[in-house]
Amino acid sequence: MRKITLPERPDLAAKAADVGFTFAHMHGEPYWDETTAYQFTLAQIEDDLEGPATELHAMVRQAVDRIVADPALMTRLGIPQAHHALIADSWARSEPAIYGRMDLVYDGTGPAKLLEYNADTPTSLYESAAFQ
């Protein structure tokens, strides 16, 4: 893995505003940082990133399967009771997800580890489609 430093787009703020990405800077700090990229070997991608990501996604789906079957778990996760049936019905119909983004930590020497998984969240539309 090799870290590559890049210049920020000179018109970043204007481009962000043009697509409604008004939170590119939050609390005086940049939320969106495009000054770093990473170059990987094929083995790193296949073995350390793609393989673990596939396994993690399967684990998340297993967890969701368990959660939607148990109203107490949905409540524990802060899901309003009024939404329980909607979520369970959507899951039972296998409605497709729009997108998902895994935030992984990877040191270049072993399998990536999951920090968080954002799927079908409003901000991800900007982060993974409109603004990239």
Residue ranges of model-derived segments:
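Preference for protein termini
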Residues: 1-132
